[in-house]
Amino acid sequence: MAEGEESKKMNLQTSYFDVVGICCSSEVSIVGNVLRQVDGVKEFSVIVPSRTVIVVHDTFLISPLQIVKALNQARLEASVRPYGETSLKSQWPSPFAIVSGVLLVLSFFKYFYSPLEWLAIVAVVAGVFPILAKAVASVTRFRLDINALTLIAVIATLCMQDFTEAATIVFLFSVADWLESSAAHKASIVMSSLMSLAPRKAVIADTGLEVDVDEVGINTVVSVKAGESIPIDGVVVDGSCDVDEKTLTGESFPVSKQRESTVMAATINLNGYIKVKTTALARDCVVAKMTKLVEEAQKSQTKTQRFIDKCSRYYTPAVVVSAACFAVIPVLLKVQDLSHWFHLALVVLVSGCPCGLILSTPVATFCALTKAATSGFLIKTGDCLETLAKIKIVAFDKTGTITKAEFMVSDFRSLSPSINLHKLLNWVSSIECKSSHPMAAALIDYAISVSVEPKPDIVENFQNFPGEGVYGRIDGQDIYIGNKRIAQRAGCLTDNVPDIEATMKRGKTIGYIYMGAKLTGSFNLLDGCRYGVAQALKELKSLGIQTAMLTGDNQDAAMSTQEQLENALDIVHSELLPQDKARIIDDFKIQGPTMMVGDGLNDAPALAKADIGISMGISGSALATETGDIILMSNDIRKIPKGMRLAKRSHKKVIENVVLSVSIKGAIMVLGFVGYPLVWAAVLADAGTCLLVILNSMILLRDEREAVSTCYRSSTSSPVKLEEDEVEDLEVGLLQKSEETSKKSCCSGCCSGPKDNQQK
């Protein structure tokens, strides 16, 4: 696929190629040897399961067609993949295979007319040319692949005057190879659909001209009509609409966008007209990074794959030597029935190609990674996928992960008679303007709502203390804002902190304001749980996974969250510093493989310590995204158990593929040893095993069959299905109308349990 990801200074372009000649990982070195000798190729990578080669090259030195020519000189059957190809081409077998098959069928009529037997030889000649070309290319590189082994089997059967079997070998091998290529191409279509999400054209709002997205710079205003895809990441500067973000986040419901809302490339404007000011170049958009991440993951090898590849290096030589022994030793011993032993040697020889076994892991991994990516669950490496299937403990951060991080100030007070509330709020909001914590935005919004204008320019020496709070110097005063621990930072003994928490119970997050060592103010913050958290925790428990919550918030706030989740969490730790979270993760890892889910700076050490770290891609900080092994593209925690089930299914498919590839070849060899050495069956088993492995792995690309939920939530006019006695409670999770209504709850628990004290 000639993809327009160019660097003007270096004239670089990324091109994608379908390379049918890649059967398994053993061909990767062949591709490498070819491309390293081509002038202008800067870097390349090979994705074996989809038979894809990705090449970054200088367009002034070499074109995609010249790269195709170089690959085809090695008989790799390469072609340029059109950009974002998403349709499956109906392709017939090669003319060689068709002619060979017709002649083979006609040769079976030899029992009625004996001269037709010679048509089998013609069938061999007609169909053997593609096999011969690939076999010669393989031998010249001092390798014995399945084409070379099959050619040896064909020549040997011809020498034994078994013409019909020779023709059968050629025809079955050609058809199986065609079916295998078609299946691999079908698997690659899903990956191609990811790359074609973002449109290639954008309309400049000022002029109405349509230009290539690669020519659109940052801060350019583009227009997007209803029904069109947003071309580049940006911010809405005019208009409003509903946007379908399912392609990136997996979120089924439209998201409302107004002025200053962030929008992403490849999402669809469902209604309305908007103008978007771009905030990134096309190559730096979320969808581009997402595609790159998936490609990198698919190129990576799992531990299982590395082990199988290592074993396969010794498998083929050992089998070839064994086949030679079965052919030579009977001759030396002057055994009478040499034909049987020669056929047995050929069966063993054809079984010497371990392609099916080598493909068993990467194809399943490829399909699982692709399916996860299309669901908004980005897994960075194959090893992460393997580890994900073995997780025993999942730890969650609270703020921004379990809860929405949409704080609301419920109480702000000055505790010093000499400082009025207006002045204190001005100090706090000015300092918080320099912080990226979700609580900071709530304090700023509260200040603006009471007509206090933050002035970040007056803040000096701003400092952030993870797990504690922030500091800033204003008007010659040292101001500290944070939780209990900030008191020690301010020089105030915690024992001297007034017990103001008694009036701030019921799960509210409490903040303190110090001027020097003196406590001068306090505030309360309210936060609610995300939709679906309780349901996700129950699903994890059904998978036999233990859940925990790690938070730097106070004990009351932590226990209030636990109550909202109907005590779904197994373990709750509160008032933790970032290093405390990392230490607890170490303790969990002693019990079993551990996963950490977080979204902020305070989670980075714990994410790094865990066997698997999941960062929230939409709400998460840049550091958390880099630290995490998996990126959750939306804030829907329910994708985590879904991703874990996919990982377990992938692990199961790998085992099935290994058993399938070994057992089929084993069965053919057993038949040979007990007196039925069928060479054509051995050829069919070898090529057929690869096909079965691919088809079995492609089951992972299907949607997982899920039970119909009793409760549905929608941001549009979609129907809501509740139990009959709960029809009135249509605003589950919002402020309840009465005490009677508040006692009712959503039947599935997807709205996070009891709804007491939740805010609209």
UniProtKB/Swiss-Prot annotation:
Q: Which key words tag this protein in UniProt?
A: ATP-binding, Cadmium, Magnesium, Membrane, Metal-binding, Nucleotide-binding, Translocase, Transmembrane, Transmembrane helix, Vacuole, Zinc
* Reactions accelerated catalytically: Zn(2+)(in) + ATP + H2O = Zn(2+)(out) + ADP + phosphate + H(+); Cd(2+)(in) + ATP + H2O = Cd(2+)(out) + ADP + phosphate + H(+)
Residues annotated as transmembrane:
90-111, 115-134, 142-162, 164-184, 311-333, 342-359, 655-674, 679-698
- Induction profile: Not induced by cadmium or zinc treatments.
Catalytic residues (UniProt) = D397 (4-aspartylphosphate intermediate)
Organism domain of life: Eukaryota
GO MF term (any one): P-type cadmium transporter activity
Give me the Gene Ontology terms describing cellular component.
vacuolar membrane
Membrane topology, as annotated, equals: Multi-pass membrane protein
Extracellular membrane side: 112-114, 163, 334-341, 675-678
Into which EC class is this enzyme placed?
Answer: translocase
Tell me where it resides: Vacuole membrane
Q: What region holds the HMA domain? A: 13-79
> What's its EC?
7.2.2.12, 7.2.2.21
Binding-site residues, Mg(2+)? D599, D603
Positions of the UniProt region annotated as Disordered: 739-760
A Pfam match is Hydrolase
Summary of the tissues where the protein is detected:
Roots, stems, leaves and flowers.
**GO terms for biological process?**
detoxification of cadmium ion
User: Where does this chain mainly localize?
Assistant: membrane
Residue spans, topological domain Cytoplasmic: 1-89, 135-141, 185-310, 360-654, 699-760
Q: So what family is this one in?
A: Belongs to the cation transport ATPase (P-type) (TC 3.A.3) family. Type IB subfamily.
Q: What does this protein do?
A: In a heterologous system, involved in cadmium and lead transport, but not in zinc transport. May have a detoxification function through a vacuolar sequestration.
Name of the protein:
Cadmium/zinc-transporting ATPase HMA3
Which organism does this record belong to? Arabidopsis thaliana
Please name the gene that encodes this protein.
HMA3
